[in-house]
Amino acid sequence: MTDAAYQACQRLAREHYENFPVASWMLPPGARPHIAAIYAFARAADDFADEGVRSPAERLALLDDWRRRLYEAASESPASGAAGESDIFVALSRTMRECRLDVRLFDDLLSAFAQDVTVTRYDTWDELLDYSRRSANPVGRLVLQVCGYRDAGLDHLSDQVCTALQLANFWQDLARDWAKGRLYVPREVFAAAPGQLRRARSAGARSNGFANATPA
């Protein structure tokens, strides 16, 4: 059953578009199924927060249930559920046990996804970087743990890389997020240079609605 669960997670990782490769061939072969399980957990949770036409209350309820199931998996008793979701937690439970993963890193991811439901703009760099600390940095630390590294220096370097990649990802998807009423550029940037927002709207991506969207 566990092998089939890992295979389902690996299929999800292969089939879902991402800006960066998932379970890359550059990773040790033994690590790839574990990375796929982590990805499947995070991908589903991110979709709860960001995709479809659910209300904010429905999104938050799904994330709360995902957190409950996370802690059940951490205690080696993954709960039953829809077939694809059960696969995720069967695989994740084994991955967490074999790789001795810190469940708090997964919880940080869920807190960031929940924040996405309720927060669409950031006033300061500190606020945006705190969000990135929870939405991106846990992934790098989990990869290190899967590969057998537990080192504060490596964690620090990984955090810097993950935050940088997260910011690059935000700004690559600026037009798409703007159309959803969300903007990952701090208000203090535009306060310091008021013309920047106007120029971004006029030069950014008229073809896909960027210029006409108006986040708060």
Q: At which residue positions do the language-model features occur?
A:
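Acidic catalytic motifs of isoprenoid enzymes
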Residues: 1-216
